[in-house]
Structures are given as structure tokens and as C-alpha cells.
Regions:
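Pre-active-site segment of Zn-dependent metallo-hydrolases
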Residues: 12-51, 56-60, 74, 110-116, ...
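Active-site-proximal loop/helix segments of hydrolase catalytic cores
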Residues: 114-123, 128-179
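Zn-dependent metallo-beta-lactamase
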Residues: 1-19, 26-29, 96, 103, ...
Length: 226
């Protein structure tokens, strides 16, 4: 499976012949200015919550590529009013799509749209097919609910966790989250985009190493194969 970091919490993930894009925040992000939006071509756009740093390019990417948006009920309604195709989930619900199964799971955070309106409650996604399973946590604090993931989903091969602190859990708590979700391989996100979430990357890697976990930190635009 090929995973490309699009900056902040944004990832492009290829599942067999389907392209999934999570939380696209590319055009407003100066750090991602080398990524051309027209080269990001999702079949599905998955949005963890309504904050601007997660949905900035959702409308354009969905429309330009005739992609299906997957998020909570409120986010899908809000985008639907703008003409975006969508499928709503709510917490604890899962659904089979062409790429595999998506389950919308709990996050401890807030959510509203850039225009200030209610965006429902924030979440994360667990995604799996017959070969691989991963978790994109969205924006969240460390929460005991994460212990439900290994009880209710296939074994995680990797997880994308926020590590930047201030608005989400920091890397110390994220390393504990890696234990809760029983996942050895973590890709960090939601760090170094803005001043309040600037962190020491070596210390972050150390925090995971101390718990026997691997923290992978990608450069914006870079890909890995898992
Ligand atoms: Ni947020
Ligand atoms: Mn955020």
C-alpha cells in the first residue's frame, strides 16, 4: 500500500486500484506549496471533522475528480449543499465501499466549519480490506475509547496519529495511544504546520521508541510503502 503525506493531517492512500485522500489541507498550506492540487486525484475523500485545516480542499478535490466524500452526517450535509457527493457515517458505524470497509470512531476534540456553523462531533477512521487495516485518528486527545479499536476492528498494520500537542495529543500521549490501539507502526501528523504545534522530532521518535513503537515522520510530498 502506497501512502503519500500531503501535509498536516492530509494523506493520499492507494488501496488496490482506489485512491483515498484524508483531510486535504494543501492549497492554504505554504509548506505544501510544491504539491499541485490537480495531481491529487482521489476516488474517495475522507474527512475526520469540519475544521478548516482538515477540509480546506475537500470541495474542490471531490468535484474535480467526481470523488465520494465520507465523513459524519453534518459534514456530508454541509458539503452536499455545495454539490459534493457524499456518504454519511456516525460514530461506531461502518460501511463497505469499493475500496474496503470504513468505520467512523470516536475522537475527543471539537468541530465547527470555517463559517462557524455546527459540524457534528469529530471522529477518526479505521479502514480495512482483506489485506491491511489502518487507523487515521483525526484530531484527538488520548482517550480510553482507543482501546475499543483492537476489540472491534481487524489488527492494525499502521496508524496515523496526531503528535503536535496544543490542539491534539502530543507525542507523549500519542505513544500511549499506540499501546491502546495495539499498533507497532505509527505515522505522525498534525505537527510543525503552525507555531503552536512545533515539536522536537527527535524527542517524539524517542517517546515511541521507549515504548517499543516505531514513529515514521514523512516529509510533505514523500511516500512510503507499507
Ligand atoms: Ni481540529
Ligand atoms: Mn486540526
Amino acid at each position: 500500500m502506497k501512502i503519500r503525506f500531503l501535509g498536516h493531517s492530509g494523506f493520499e492512500i492507494k488501496m488496490k486500484n482506489h485512491t483515498l485522500v484524508f483531510d486535504p489541507y494543501i492549497s492554504p498550506n505554504e509548506l505544501a506549496s510544491h504539491i499541485n492540487l490537480s495531481e491529487v486525484q482521489p476516488d474517495f475523500v475522507l474527512l475526520t471533522h469540519g475544521h478548516g485545516d482538515h477540509i480546506a480542499d475537500a470541495e474542490q478535490l471531490s468535484k474535480d475528480n467526481d470523488a465520494l466524500c465520507i465523513s459524519n452526517y453534518e459534514v456530508i450535509n454541509w458539503l452536499g449543499a455545495k454539490g459534493v457527493k457524499g456518504h454519511p457515517l456516525n460514530h461506531g458505524g461502518k460501511k463497505e465501499f469499493a475500496f474496503g470497509t470504513a468505520k467512523y470512531v470516536n475522537a475527543i476534540h471539537t468541530s465547527s466549519f470555517p463559517d462557524g456553523t455546527y459540524a457534528g462531533n469529530p471522529g477518526g477512521f479505521v479502514i480495512w480490506d482483506d489485506e491491511i487495516c489502518f487507523y487515521h485518528a483525526g484530531d484527538t486527545a488520548l482517550t480510553l475509547d482507543m482501546k475499543l479499536i483492537p476489540l472491534t476492528c481487524p489488527k492494525l498494520d499502521f496508524a496515523i496519529l496526531p503528535i503536535g500537542d496544543n490542539f491534539t495529543m502530543g507525542y507523549e500521549d500519542a505513544a500511549i495511544a499506540a499501546d491502546y490501539i495495539d499498533c507497532p507502526k505509527i505515522i505522525g501528523c498534525h505537527f510543525n504546520t503552525f507555531a503552536p504545534i512545533t515539536i522536537d522530532l527527535e524527542k517524539a521518535k524517542e517517546a515511541f521508541k521507549n515504548r517499543g513503537k516505531e514513529l515514521i515522520l514523512l516529509e510533505i510530498g514523500d511516500s512510503i510503502e507499507i
